[in-house]
Every structure is written in C-alpha cells, then in structure tokens.
C-alpha cells in the first residue's frame, strides 16, 4: 500500500483519456448537449446540429489545443508546463486509440451535421471551418509547433 500517493503516473494528463468509461461519457455529453439545444423553442433542427458541432469543436479546441500545463503538482520538473493537453496525451505517442477516437469524433459529428443541415452552404462553410480548426492542430507534424508564436508561453 502506497501511503500518500493517489496515482502512479508522473503526469495524470497523459492517461486520462484511457480511463474506463471516458469515451462513453464523452459521447453521452455530446448527445446531452444536442438534446439540450433541441429543447430550445423556435430553433430549427439544422441550426441545432450546427450549434452542437460548433460548441463541441470550440470546447475541444480550447481544452485540448489551447490550455497548457497540468492542474497537478507533477515531479516531471515542469516538462508539461509548455505542452497542451493534446501534446501530453499518451506521453506524446502518435496514433494511439485515444488520439484516433478524439480525431474521428469531430469528423463523424461533421458528417451528421452536414447530412441533417442538407448541405446548406452557410452551415457547410461554418462546420467545415470548425472541423479544420480542430483537425489541423492534431496533425503529428504540428506536435509542439506554435503557428505565428500563438500560445507560445
């Protein structure tokens, strides 16, 4: 028994998406967001799908690609301080199951949104820009890269 230790990870951010039930909880949260938006009166179904997609992608961008560091006191000598959550995930190993899941989820949501908005031009452009804003930072070539110095410190 380890007294005084809550986990064995140096940085718990690296393994959080591999926790039991996290993928199901994530999908259920997206579904709950969609149902809450559907319950708003006088909002059409295409607008609700677009809002679901935009809110999901905005949240994903903020939490995975903007916020840096870790909320825990880690013994890693501050190595995680300058890394986003996406860069910390799975110790930086590319193409893991969690990374694939978090890459495919916005794509599936984009396809659903495009279908239910009947490929309306305005919705299509908004959803495509939103999708690109969360897919481009996930590319392995952009690991640790700060474009134009944005979010460098």
From Swiss-Prot:
The modification Hydroxyproline is found at residue 137. GO terms for biological process: ceramide metabolic process; intracellular sphingolipid homeostasis; motor behavior; myelination; negative regulation of B cell apoptotic process; negative regulation of ceramide biosynthetic process; positive regulation of autophagy; positive regulation of protein localization to nucleus. It is found in: Endoplasmic reticulum membrane. Its main location: endoplasmic reticulum. Changing residue 16 to R: Impaired negative regulation of SPT complex activity in the presence of ceramides. InterPro entries: ORMDL. The keyword Lipid biosynthesis does not apply. Residues 1-17 are annotated as: Important for ceramide level-sensing. It is a multi-pass membrane protein. The chain crosses the membrane at residues 22-44, 45-63, 101-117, 122-139. Keywords: Asthma, Endoplasmic reticulum, Hydroxylation, Membrane, Transmembrane, Transmembrane helix, Ubl conjugation. GO terms for cellular component: endoplasmic reticulum; endoplasmic reticulum membrane; plasma membrane; secretory granule membrane; serine palmitoyltransferase complex; specific granule membrane. When hydroxylated at Pro-137, ubiquitinated via 'Lys-48'-linkage, leading to proteasomal degradation. In endothelial cells, ORMDL3 proteasomal degradation is controlled by the sphingosine 1-phosphate receptor signaling pathway. Ceramide-sensitive subunit of the serine palmitoyltransferase (SPT) complex, which is also composed of SPTLC1, SPTLC2/3 and SPTSSA/B. It is linked to Asthma: The most common chronic disease affecting children and young adults. It is a complex genetic disorder with a heterogeneous phenotype, largely attributed to the interactions among many genes and between these genes and the environment. It is characterized by recurrent attacks of paroxysmal dyspnea, with wheezing due to spasmodic contraction of the bronchi. This is ORM1-like protein 3. It comes from Homo sapiens.
């Amino acid at each position: 028994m380890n007294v005084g230790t809550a986990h064995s990870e140096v940085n718990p951010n690296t393994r959080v998406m591999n926790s039991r039930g996290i993928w199901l909880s994530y999908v259920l949260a997206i579904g709950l967001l969609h149902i809450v938006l559907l319950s708003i009166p006088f909002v059409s179904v295409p607008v609700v799908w677009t809002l679901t997609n935009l809110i999901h992608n905005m949240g994903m961008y903020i939490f995975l690609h903007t916020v840096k560091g870790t909320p825990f006191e880690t013994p890693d000598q501050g190595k995680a301080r300058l890394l986003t959550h996406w860069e910390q995930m799975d110790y930086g190993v590319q193409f893991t199951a969690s990374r694939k899941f978090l890459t495919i989820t916005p794509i599936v949501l984009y396809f659903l949104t495009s279908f239910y908005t009947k490929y309306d031009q305005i919705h299509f452009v908004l959803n495509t820009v939103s999708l690109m804003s969360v897919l481009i930072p996930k590319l392995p070539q952009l690991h640790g890269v700060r474009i134009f110095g944005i979010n460098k410190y």
